[in-house]
Structure formats: structure tokens, C-alpha cells
Amino acid sequence: MDFNQVKVINHPLIQHKLTIMRKKETSTVKFRTLMHEVSMLLAYEVTRDLEIEYEEIETPLATMQSPVLKGKKLVFVSILRAGNGLLDGMLQLVPTARIGHIGLYRDPKTLEAVEYYFKLPEHTQDRDVIVVDPMLATGNSAIAAVKEVKALHPKSIKFLCLLASPEGISNFHGEHPDVPIFTAAIDEQLNDHGYIVPGLGDAGDRLYGTKLAH
């Protein structure tokens, strides 16, 4: 597996919070709060290379050239439904970002992604896009979502997740070798049901309290 396009964000705060999220006894409320906090920390890293330019401003004491973000506003694209759990924290850091949603569910028999919703901001072309989903398991949902985004000709695309599997990374970069993956951890493997092991269960279920995590 080629890890040149994979960035593991091994920050102590992220790893500590992720450990609590993994615990089966962590409540829905606590899980949701931690997801918000971790997403802010991940967003800080994934936006590290945004372009800047300089504008002249006046401080109370002097005039100076000071850096500001260059170009059009970012676009965050959430893969529904669990991707929404990452958005609030990211928007707190980048409140001017545009938001898109791609609805995909995984067929339980084939594990393939099935699309049911697609809505992205106008003029996504020439913008930097960050596609978000907490789990990169089989990679099928991420592959399908990024394919849709690419059709709109953005300036750049990155994929951000909490956890990734080796299989998911391999599958994703088999289809999109040009798209970097940012993740908090790479776990051991997938089980027969396509869940990341040891993982944290089903991120959507744990976010919204819809059923017990696997």
C-alpha cells in the first residue's frame, strides 16, 4: 500500500479523544461532543496548506501587510449521514465555508455504495473541496462521492476521516490516487460485515443513538 497520499494526524489531543470515542460505554452525548472537538482539530491540519495573500491593514499603531486566505471559499462535502457529525466543528473553525451533501448508503449484501441524494453549492469549480466521512471502511462510499465531486472540476479535493482501514485506503487510492487522505488512525482490518476493527462501531448510530454499536 502506498502511504505517500495518507496523512495520519497523530496529535495527542486527537488520540486521547479518539480513545474515549472507541469505548463501547461512551454515551451518545459524549460521543457527539468528542466528534465535534476532534473535527476542529482535524480541520486545523487539513487546511494547513491553504493559499494566502497579503493585504494592507491598519493596526492601532501602524500600517502593515498582513496575510489573509486567498481565492474562493472552501467547500465541505459531507457523506450522509455520519459525515454531518464532522461538519459543526469544522464550520466553527471555517464559518465561511460552503456546504454540500451526498447521500450514500451501503448495500448490506454487496457493500457497494448506493446514492440517494446529491446537493453541492453552485460554482464549486475552482474551489478547494474537503470531503468528510468519519469512517473509510471499504472505501466504496468515499470513492463514489469523490467521483461526483470531480465531475464539477474543483481546484483540489481532500478526503478527511476519523478512522481508515488498510483495505479502504487501497481501494480508494486505486480509484483516486491523486486525492490525499487525512485520518486520525489506520486500524487493523475490516470484518466480514465491512466494519473497521477494532474501530468504534457504526459512527452514525453512535452519533444519533439509533441503535447499539456493533
Curated annotation (Swiss-Prot):
Keywords: Allosteric enzyme, Glycosyltransferase, GTP-binding, Magnesium, Nucleotide-binding, Transferase. Pathway: Pyrimidine metabolism; UMP biosynthesis via salvage pathway; UMP from uracil: step 1/1. GO terms for molecular function: GTP binding; magnesium ion binding; uracil phosphoribosyltransferase activity. Binds 1 Mg(2+) ion per subunit. The magnesium is bound as Mg-PRPP. Allosterically activated by GTP. Uracil binds at I196, G201, D202, A203. GO terms for biological process: UMP salvage; uracil salvage. It catalyses: UMP + diphosphate = 5-phospho-alpha-D-ribose 1-diphosphate + uracil. The keyword Magnesium applies. The keyword Magnesium applies. Pfam families: UPRTase. Its EC number is 2.4.2.9. 5-phospho-alpha-D-ribose 1-diphosphate binds at R81, R106, D133, P134, M135, L136, A137, T138, G139, N140, S141, D202. It comes from the Bacteria. Belongs to the UPRTase family. Catalyzes the conversion of uracil and 5-phospho-alpha-D-ribose 1-diphosphate (PRPP) to UMP and diphosphate. This is Uracil phosphoribosyltransferase.
